[in-house]
């Protein structure tokens, strides 16, 4: 199966952490920043400046324009410190060749199960592995790591901070699920670095984005995590009204 591999990047021209670990991934950068990225040895795909602006817009541009005769597109954050799996109770970082094999085999699995989007766990906690259910089909898939088998679903550009929750729900609504590999997880520095979506992320905007997401899907599906010790938890809980795992 032919798969294209991309990492959108904005205002982070230093050598990409992701590309150091996984050199098969190409950074997708806007034209006005391209020279700075090239100076630091990044392998890039140049897109028009208008393709950037928020994380949903650039991902949609990739999905609309960069399949390059592939059956699927892999999109990962540009600051990924590694993709890990649990083997014999130990957390192991995948090398470049192992990740390529992992992506291809699970993309085939996803397609065979009738889904068009798959990803991995968003937390490293061993408790999230769930040995007896290593696969999920009704679970949230974070946008830092996702594979998209060609389809017509796109990210909501009005939800640039909650785009992955909405995107997951769109796939579940249309295809009755999407595949999550629970025994693997990604490690990224979300909201900790300059550039990316941190340029427009703040508490006020997070609350506004939550309200928009809840208005779109309803309060029975989108709820606040009341168990959180934070004054306001950025991450909503999604409750899927379907039976399954």
Residues of each region from the PLM?
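A structural signal for short, well-ordered beta-strand segments and their strand-loop junctions
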Residues: 72-77, 116-121, 178-182, 222-225
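A short acidic (Asp/Glu
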Residues: 16-18, 37-38, 84-87, 128-133, ...
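Short, solvent-exposed loop/turn segments at secondary-structure junctions
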Residues: 10-12, 79-81, 123-126, 152, ...
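Active-site-proximal specificity loops/subdomain of glycosyltransferases
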Residues: 29-76, 81-95
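C-terminal catalytic/acceptor-binding lobe
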Residues: 1-4, 11-13, 159-161, 165-245
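Short coil/turn segments at beta-strand junctions that form active-site/ligand-binding loops
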Residues: 1, 23, 42, 69-72, ...
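Conserved catalytic core of nucleotide-sugar-dependent glycosyltransferases
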Residues: 83-166
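Short, well-formed alpha-helical segments that are part of the catalytic scaffolds
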Residues: 4-25, 29-39
């Amino acid at each position: 199966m032919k798969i294209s591999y991309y990492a959108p990047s904005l205002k982070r021209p230093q050598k990409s952490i992701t590309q150091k670990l996984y050199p098969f991934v190409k950074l997708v950068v806007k034209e006005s920043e391209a020279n700075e990225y090239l100076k630091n040895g990044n392998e890039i795909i140049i897109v028009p400046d208008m393709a950037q602006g928020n994380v949903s817009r650039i991902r949609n541009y990739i999905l609309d324009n960069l399949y390059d005769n592939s059956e699927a597109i892999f999109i990962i954050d540009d600051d990924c410190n590694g993709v890990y799996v649990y083997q014999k109770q130990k957390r192991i970082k995948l090398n470049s060749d192992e990740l390529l094999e992992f992506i291809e085999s699970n993309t085939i699995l996803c397609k065979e199960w009738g889904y068009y989007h798959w990803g991995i766990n968003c937390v490293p906690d061993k408790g999230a592995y769930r040995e007896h259910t290593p696969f999920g089909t009704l679970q949230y898939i974070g946008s830092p790591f996702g594979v998209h088998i060609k389809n017509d679903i796109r990210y909501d550009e009005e939800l640039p901070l909650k785009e992955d929750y909405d995107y997951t729900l769109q796939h579940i609504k249309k295809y009755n699920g999407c595949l999550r590999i629970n025994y693997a997880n990604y490690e990224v520095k979300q909201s900790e670095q300059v550039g990316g979506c941190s340029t427009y992320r703040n508490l006020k905007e997070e609350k506004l984005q939550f309200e928009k997401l809840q208005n779109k899907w309803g309060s029975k599906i989108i709820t606040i995590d009341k168990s959180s010790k934070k004054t306001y938890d950025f991450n909503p809980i999604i409750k899927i009204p379907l039976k399954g795992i």
